[in-house]
């Protein structure tokens, strides 16, 4: 570990940080010390997450130390020097003094897009000097509820049943939270991610969901998904306190869209009809005394049900009155019309609280009905409870003025669907129904409500935020600190080419008017076929959209190009469903890492799962091909209205983008994000190939990430491209492919696992290790969690390592010096369940037979596909009998595991 002092704050870092990491941490500290907001861009692979965590927690640690000194000074004063406040403070218990509300210590809130990204950040935290800090993560009941009878339930029904059981104290797991929250077995775990708290919950029989809410009260840093912060309804439900908090939005390139969507909603005529039928059915049940319906506790009466039904009937009538223009484009109304619409139905700013309260009581009651037509229902009523809360987020004239500026109500005809098998007695689908889209076009609308909570600082950070000015203008946040960092890699590690024509000289242009051109599609396919012959290992190909990707796939299969490409590299296509996606990703990694093959191709779409959240370091992504610019659908009503909104804003404030500038930037940002899947650390290298002539436009080039702009080169013909790529990969392999990672003072890659050596047909490349068990590689939300690369062996030997490229004494001593318990835990964490069972069986057989040859043969079988974990084998020496130690040592030396 190394300690650097920046802006008066000592920061313990796993290695000597690079200059760009120091600059990044200085900007973070500037935000925290000056209580201002920051927008910080640093490319993927520059150690952004590590720098963010270390600088933030170092600042918090200093605040803690200062507070501790102040307490000691208070304790040393004589009686006459105490004020009444000091006496009061002195009488507080240690627990009270440590509470964040009493201590005045700010809480760090770290939010990212997905739980897999949060999990990666928490694993990063565990490997720092700040692993003694208290950290927890907030998740949904789907992730954290372990009650057996609700195990198979999801979504709204699970939430309702949980709330009911808590209310009636019929959940034995919830009832133990209060008792167990101060248990040393719980409080003794500093960093608790979702897996940790679920395991502890199962062990100690408490509810992980409610325990997480308790733990956040004392946590130094709380991890949570974006929507927990940006959705006002969820934020209130989760009781997230933002006063004096430091809020970090990592991977914030999507924050504008998320803010808009959190403040938007949709109402269908069929939703209103279903709500009417839900209320009607309850009224009928209450009138039927034979069902003993009145025996159940209720917080509503028949008159209230009648009033609620009348509201929905009136709302249905008012929606039906809205006239639609002829054609599919629909009708656009001012945003404030939503207040008029609900007002005519009887819900206003003055009474909406009572309406939402009534709906909540009804929904809660329906949760108690476990059988019959009401079981598991009330979903539409619950939806309207949330809708009304969003509509009436504010009630002042100023709020309505903002709605008038930032919102539009777009109404279209509802598609008539076949009636599904439903619990309701009558058909809900009807002709002439409408869809009301209440769209927010200002990210600042939601962000302002967040900022109004009194937070200390807001830090937005990502690898792709630029240009910063329009982002800041749209979010309407006062930003005091800005940063656009360069990349950590050199020009020899990146080859960026714009390709305007294929090998047959056919122009490559995936514009709306050319994407159906068979000549273009064929030329694109031939371009990819040729490139697979010079690009080693893993190749990513991103298309602007699913339809375009499927169109290309279909044509290439018909003309034989698909089979030709597949003969070079196995092709995998990004599916839309979770299970198929996980399977495709697992197979792709296996093919890339198979030394008998030439690699693999993964075809995906910009803004898809692959382009947003995954790490294709080293051989997993030696090149990325972008086949076109992913512009939003030009004729989409929401896109049209967004462009108009921005044009109006730009007319009065030039800091705002014009509509067409935003439209272009949407495509460029998606491309930048897709490109960020490769070049993941300081020793990585790869090619970025832009196969669309439009990339040669100066405006588009100017919207690419800062670290790419000066590296972009246009190649006039395909032959020159092939020659340049051969030379690039040959030189990069010589300079970086077999790089030995020994302990040194140089800074390693901050974010990902150490790669193993991959030997292909022509090259000897580095490729990141992939766990053989899909259960370790796949996250619950459909994202693939690539195991993050630990600090390479530049770190001190005391740092836990999963793999070393060149085994060395320091690493082996680290394994050998562990206790028996620690060693077994280390092996269990590294191996999948099946391999660990085989491992323990091999030890048992050796213990029973004393045959060391059988032991080494078993180890060879277990670790054959896990060569990156063979460093664990020498740790078995303490288990080997004295008479076998020499033979075991020889085995380790022969396999390069001991010097």
Predicted regions and their residues:
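Conserved interdomain hinge at the start of the Helicase C-terminal
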Residues: 449, 507-544
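Conserved pre-motif I regulatory segment
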Residues: 1-41, 51-54
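Conserved helicase motor "Helicase C" RecA-like lobe of SF1/SF2 P-loop NTPases
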Residues: 546-575
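Acidic, Ser/Pro/Thr-rich low-complexity regulatory regions
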Residues: 741-899
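A contiguous, basic/glycine-rich beta-loop/short-helix subdomain that forms a polymer-engagement track
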Residues: 194-219, 230-239, 352-506, 522, ...
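A substrate-engagement module of RecA-like helicase motors
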Residues: 2-15, 19, 60-222, 227-230, ...
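SF2 helicase catalytic motif II
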Residues: 241-269, 273
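Conserved RecA-like P-loop NTPase helicase motor core
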Residues: 502-519, 572-698
């Amino acid at each position: 570990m190394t300690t650097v002092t920046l802006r008066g704050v000592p920061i313990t870092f796993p290695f000597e940080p690079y200059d760009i990491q120091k600059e990044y941490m200085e900007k973070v500290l500037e935000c925290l010390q000056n209580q201002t907001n920051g927008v910080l861009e640093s490319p993927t692979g520059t150690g952004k997450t590590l720098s963010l965590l270390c600088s933030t927690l170092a600042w918090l640690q200093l605040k803690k130390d200062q507070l501790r000194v102040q307490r000691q000074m208070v304790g040393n004063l004589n009686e006459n020097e105490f004020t009444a406040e000091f006496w009061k403070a002195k009488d507080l218990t240690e627990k009270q003094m440590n509470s964040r509300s009493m201590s005045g210590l700010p809480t760090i809130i770290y939010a990212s897009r997905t739980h897999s990204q949060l999990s990666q950040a928490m694993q990063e935290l565990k490997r720092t000097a700040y692993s003694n800090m208290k950290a927890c993560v907030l998740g949904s009941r789907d992730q954290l509820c372990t009650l057996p009878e609700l195990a198979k339930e999801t979504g709204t029904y699970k939430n309702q049943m949980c709330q009911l059981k808590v209310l009636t104290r019929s959940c034995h797991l919830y009832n133990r939270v209060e008792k167990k929250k101060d248990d040393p077995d719980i409080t003794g775990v500093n960093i608790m991610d979702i897996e940790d708290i679920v395991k502890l919950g199962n062990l100690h029989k408490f509810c992980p969901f409610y325990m997480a809410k308790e733990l956040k009260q004392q946590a130094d840093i709380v991890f949570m998904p974006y929507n927990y912060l940006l959705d006002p309804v969820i934020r209130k439900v989760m009781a997230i306190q933002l006063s004096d908090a430091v809020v970090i939005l990592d991977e914030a390139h999507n924050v504008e869209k998320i803010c808009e969507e959190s403040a938007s909603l949709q109402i269908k005529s069929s939703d209103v009809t279903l709500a009417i039928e839900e209320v009607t059915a309850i009224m009928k049940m209450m009138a039927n005394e034979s069902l003993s319906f009145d025996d159940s506790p209720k917080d509503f009466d028949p008159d209230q049900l009648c009033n609620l039904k009348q509201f929905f009937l009136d709302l249905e009538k008012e929606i039906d009155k809205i006239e639609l223009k002829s054609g599919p484009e629909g009708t656009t109304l001012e945003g404030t019309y939503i207040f008029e619409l609900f007002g005519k139905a009887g819900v206003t700013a003055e009474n909406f609280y009572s309406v939402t309260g009534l709906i909540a009581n009804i929904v809660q009651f329906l949760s108690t009905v476990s059988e019959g037509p009401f079981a598991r229902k009330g979903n539409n009523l619950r939806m309207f409870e949330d809708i009304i809360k969003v509509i009436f987020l504010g009630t002042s004239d100023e709020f309505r003025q903002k709605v008038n500026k930032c919102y539009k109500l777009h109404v279209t005809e509802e598609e008539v669907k076949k009636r599904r098998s439903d619990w309701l007695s009558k058909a809900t689908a009807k002709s002439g129904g409408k869809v009301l889209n209440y769209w927010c076009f200002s990210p600042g609308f939601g962000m302002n409500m967040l900022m109004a909570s009194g937070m200390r600082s807001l830090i937005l950070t990502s690898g792709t935020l630029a240009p910063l000015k329009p982002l800041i203008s749209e979010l309407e946040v006062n930003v005091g600190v800005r940063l656009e960092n360069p990349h950590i890699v050199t020009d020899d590690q990146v080859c960026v080419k714009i390709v305007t024509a294929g090998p047959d000289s056919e122009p490559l242009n995936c514009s709306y008017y050319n994407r159906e051109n068979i000549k273009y599609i064929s030329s694109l396919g031939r371009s990819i076929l040729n490139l697979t012959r010079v690009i080693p290992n893993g190749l990513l190909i991103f298309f602007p959209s699913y339809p375009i990707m499927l169109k290309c796939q279909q044509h290439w299969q018909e003309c034989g190009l698909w089979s030709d490409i597949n003969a070079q590299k196995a092709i995998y296509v990004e599916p839309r469903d979770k299970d198929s996606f996980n399977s495709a990703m697992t197979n792709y990694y296996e093919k890339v890492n198979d030394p008998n093959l030439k690699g693999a191709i993964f075809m995906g779409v910009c803004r898809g799962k692959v382009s947003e959240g995954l790490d294709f370091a080293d051989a997993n992504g030696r090149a990325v091909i972008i086949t076109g610019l992913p512009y939003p659908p030009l004729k989409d009503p929401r896109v049209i209205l967004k462009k108009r909104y921005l044009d109006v804003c730009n007319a009065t404030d030039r800091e705002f983008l014009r509509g067409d500038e935003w439209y272009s930037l949407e495509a460029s940002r998606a491309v930048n994000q897709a490109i960020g899947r490769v070049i993941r650390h300081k020793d990585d290298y790869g090619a970025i190939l832009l196969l669309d002539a439009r990339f040669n436009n100066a405006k588009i080039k100017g919207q690419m990430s800062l670290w790419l702009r000066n590296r972009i080169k246009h190649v006039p013909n395909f032959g020159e491209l092939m020659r340049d790529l051969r030379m690039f990969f040959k030189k990069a392999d010589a300079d970086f492919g077999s790089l030995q990672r020994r302990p040194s003072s140089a800074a390693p890659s901050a974010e990902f696992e150490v790669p193993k050596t991959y030997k292909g047909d022509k090259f000897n490349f580095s490729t990141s290790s992939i766990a053989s068990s899909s259960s370790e590689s796949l996250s619950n939300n459909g994202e693939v969690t690539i195991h993050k690369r630990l600090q390479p062996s530049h770190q001190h030997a005391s740092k836990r390592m999963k793999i070393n490229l060149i085994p060395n004494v320091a690493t082996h001593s680290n394994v050998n010096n562990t206790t028996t318990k620690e060693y077994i835990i280390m092996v269990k964490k590294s191996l999948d369940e099946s391999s660990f069972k085989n491992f323990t069986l091999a030890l048992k057989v050796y213990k029973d037979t004393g045959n060391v040859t059988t032991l080494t043969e078993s180890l060879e079988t277990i670790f054959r596909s896990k060569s990156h974990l063979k460093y664990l084998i020498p740790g078995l020496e303490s288990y080997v009998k004295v008479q076998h130690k020499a033979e075991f040592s020889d085995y380790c030396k022969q396999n390069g595991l001991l010097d």
